[in-house]
Amino acid sequence: MGNELQHRTVLLDEAVESLVTRPDGIYVDGTFGRGGHSRAVLARLAEGGRLIAFDKDPRAIETAQRIEDARFSIVHDSFASMRDALAARGIEKVSGVLLDLGVSSPQVDDPARGFSFRADGPLDMRMDPTRGESAAEWLARASVQELTEVIRDYGEERFAFQIAKALVARRAESDRLGPLDTTGELAQIVGHVVKTREKGKDPATRTFQAIRIHVNQELADLQVVLDAALSLLEQGGRLVVISFHSLEDRIVKRFMQAHASAPAVDRRLPIRAVDLPSPPLKIISRQFPSEAEVVANPRARSAVMRIAERVTP
């Protein structure tokens, strides 16, 4: 329970207020985490409402299974499986989808999960430690080119090539030093390469973010779930997404803008704009944590919440 108590759900009231438009509707929490949003949604639902939550983390599933509410069910899988998982339950349309992206505080704060450079632990970084390739396993085989691309594209790290070369050089010493399999050593290697410091940021921040995103396929899964949410939302249904870094937010912003804009019409063609299909989404708002929330929970500082509504059947 300690981690659950320490974890503070970001933009809790604002997200649920924006999401729940019909108390008797069917809602999806794509990232259960420690259940802050899910519990708040359930508190707003009528007896006929339903909430289906998703999470890859076995510990999140354990927490979810303690919720004794007939209106609630949990799916141990990525939110990228949302379309198929709901179809298997006979659900074709939902009243709202909530996505709280990124890694949760309990995951970061547990050195055994391998997400943090602040405490030494096994180099894992998987949201679900029972599935897929760990960070250490990927680092043991990735080429300089692949490492460079991941660290550059997912970490927006300008020293990506130098870090990649240092990681491959360390791998060449595995017979003498053993495998690179701890967060502490990874952070140390990056720190030797990245000499400049961003204010308030550890030199390893961008590299750890990049490797975590790659290992968990976070951006690919995000694109899949956005497409699924668009097709699942009923008319008037809401899509609410909380992002914590620019890569995620850029994808969400572009997705919402693309589906809230009417298609361009070539003036040379005999087509009137009014004759074209209406865009399926309407952008409702963009919100940020209040100053008071950031003071109480510094990890909320980088959060941005975007809300869109389905306006076509």
Curated annotation (Swiss-Prot):
The keyword Cytoplasm belongs to this UniProt entry's keyword annotation: yes
GO BP field: rRNA base methylation
Record key words, sorted: Cytoplasm, Methyltransferase, rRNA processing, S-adenosyl-L-methionine, Transferase
One Pfam short name: Methyltransf_5
Residues holding S-adenosyl-L-methionine: G35, G36, H37, D55, F79, D100, Q107
Location within or outside the cell: Cytoplasm
Catalytic activity line of the entry: cytidine(1402) in 16S rRNA + S-adenosyl-L-methionine = N(4)-methylcytidine(1402) in 16S rRNA + S-adenosyl-L-homocysteine + H(+)
Assigned EC number: 2.1.1.199
GO molecular-function terms, A-Z: rRNA (cytosine-N4-)-methyltransferase activity
Enzyme class: transferase
InterPro entries: RsmH, SAM-dep_MeTrfase_MraW_recog, SAM-dependent_MTases_sf
Cellular component terms (Gene Ontology): cytoplasm
SUPFAM superfamilies documented for this protein: Putative methyltransferase TM0872, insert domain, S-adenosyl-L-methionine-dependent methyltransferases
Role of this protein: Specifically methylates the N4 position of cytidine in position 1402 (C1402) of 16S rRNA.
Similarity comment: family membership: Belongs to the methyltransferase superfamily. RsmH family.
Protein name: Ribosomal RNA small subunit methyltransferase H
Species the sequence originates in: Burkholderia ambifaria (strain ATCC BAA-244 / DSM 16087 / CCUG 44356 / LMG 19182 / AMMD)
The gene coding this protein: rsmH
